[in-house]
Amino acid sequence: MSTKRVDMGSRDYISSLPDEILGKILSLFCTNRAACTSVLSKRWRNLLELVDNLDLNDAYGNHQYFCDFVDRTLALLSNSTTVKRFSLNCAFHNDASRVNSWIRTVFDRGFLDLHLETAHMHRIDTEFFTSNTLLELTICGGFYAEGRLPPGRVFFPALKSLSLVSVEFTDTLMYQNFISGCPVLEELFLHYDNETQCPAWKGLVSSPSIKRLNIYDNPSELRYEAYKCCFQIPSLVYLDYSSYVAKQYAVDLVSLEEARLNIRYPERLVDQNEDIFGDVTDLLKGISNVKTLHLSSDSLEVFHLCCDTMPVFHNLLTLSFESDEEIGWQVVPLLLNKSPNLETLVIKSLVHQVTDMCGNACACISKRRKKKKKTTEDDECCLSTCQVKVLNISGYRGTCKELKQMRHFLENLKCLETVNVGVDVKRREYKNGNNKYQRITNAVMELPRFSSNCQIQFF
């Protein structure tokens, strides 16, 4: 079949697009750069008025020019009905009154989405910090609220999503008044690290409306000493929580369906061999209604060290956890026994530390357990009572220990229907056709299986 060369000529096809399309295209660029297109031709001169997103970053060009550019842009778009999102990223220290005037303009114009980020400390006046139209708000870095937030005041009656990244508050009460001032808030994202020096998040989230909560909290040692955690969120459906173990938990999470936990034990306490600190018992009771639970390897260790009584997870259908060669599986048998309706078990890597307390969920046997094996070999394996139908293993490298653990699973999980194994090797690592991947998969396929319905797949 012959091909015809299509002569596109020198026609400017982009300029011939409808205004609405060009406005969408310009909205994808930083506004500083998008404004440069106005010099291309008369066709492009006024297209900036059609953008629906203002993305302003003073890292480009002259600092004074940037401030003047923001003033001119906001004035130019004073009557625009298309702009819905405003993003301001200040790499330099700008005049606080000028920045506040920009933010006030955004609130007055009825924008739907506001993103504020700065590398320096910038004060936000609380007297005008309110909007009836804002749906999404993100505050990052050095922006902080100055003044008092009156309790009971509604600041953002329509706000659905709030993200606070290293945002500092005068005190805990001010933070809670801010959250309470968002009565229909559905999604809250909190990110704090130990670089924060001033008062920040203190472990409290209380809201009747929040449905999704993401927390990454890495407190300084000073703040950790008095660390307590309170989640009073009865409508919460999804929780992603990463922090050090707290001294105490008070939770109301009756609607929770999925939890992703990365709870860590302070390294300085481990290094100093101090007494066990922290208690996750009430936290686990509070999330015992979940259907899906994801655990980091650190969480396994904390559950083992800091939980007095493990609750029964009657609704748990999917359990996922990560392994680490320096952390044992001591708590895994207890988790499996306390999950009577578990259907899917997901494990990221089978390599873990061999201990005397991994129980019969593990095929690894320490020297001490070998001596006691004869007296315990008749004990019922916790895997044999599991209702698990789907087993997902990732990071599988085919070592002798891993193969032994795979055998242990296949021989004891009686209800298995599907096993998905993610092999972590290159398909061909050697010359002369020696396929290591094939040898690993063949070894797994040759393992005996208790369930005749069990099918093994590789990815």
From Swiss-Prot:
Location of the F-box domain: 11-63
Keyword Repeat: yes
Pfam families, sorted: F-box, LRR_At5g56370
Coiled-coil features, chain-numbered ranges: none
Keywords annotated in UniProt: Leucine-rich repeat, Repeat
Residue stretches of each LRR repeat: 66-90, 140-164, 166-192, 216-243, 292-323, 324-349
Name of the protein in question: F-box/LRR-repeat protein At2g29930
Organism the protein comes from: Arabidopsis thaliana (Mouse-ear cress)
